[in-house]
Amino acid sequence: MIFRQLRRFLVFLLLIATIGLLLYQYIHFIKEPDLTEVPPPTALHPVVAEKKEELIALAAKKGINVVITQDFRSIEEQDALYEKGRTAEGNIVTHAKGGESYHNFGLAIDFALMSVDGQVIWDMNYDSNGNSKADWMEVVEIAKDLGFEWGGDWTQFKDYPHLQMDFGLTIWELQRGKRPPETE
């Protein structure tokens, strides 16, 4: 009986020691990249830039003029945008602070429509090509076919002009220096 208890205690100690050793190795030897080590992007990711141009061209073939209103956005620009409706005048337009948006990593664009006379149109029901389909949704369909995720599909904060390609990376991973490949 005493032998059994001693054996259980030793197995328990061995298990605790193993967990402790693994934790020690993880903390001291597995170092994730840090933003200080990986320079932040300064432009739109090449794949996103290419898909943006394809989106504009494919929409034009359907008689829809698309204008890109935002693409890469610096952390400072993001912080200023975040302040709108909070400490700066205007409506709240984002819940993402600097470094928390896919725009800050060159992985997102915002679009609008443009009329033939050059007016930027935010009307999601606008039908300039007269095919009885909302141009906005036609652009969204093209974008999704190209691999973009649409902010209008989000459940929390719908961002109808927003299109992004996250390449399976979270903001947390991007903040720690992970980057998508430069090509598809």
Give the location of each predicted region:
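Extracytoplasmic/secreted proteins, especially bacterial periplasmic and envelope-associated proteins
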Residues: 47-50, 54, 76, 134-138, ...
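Surface-exposed patches in mature extracellular/periplasmic domains of secreted proteins
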Residues: 63-72, 149-157
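Hydrophobic membrane-insertion alpha-helices, especially the h-region
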Residues: 8-26
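Electropositive
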Residues: 82-92
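Signal peptide cleavage region of secreted peptide precursors
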Residues: 26-32
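Acidic helix-start/capping segments at beta-turn-to-alpha-helix junctions
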Residues: 66-84, 160
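Active-site acidic/histidine clusters and adjacent loop/turn architecture
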Residues: 32-70
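Catalytic cores and adjacent binding grooves of peptidoglycan-active enzymes
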Residues: 4, 8-12, 88, 95-184
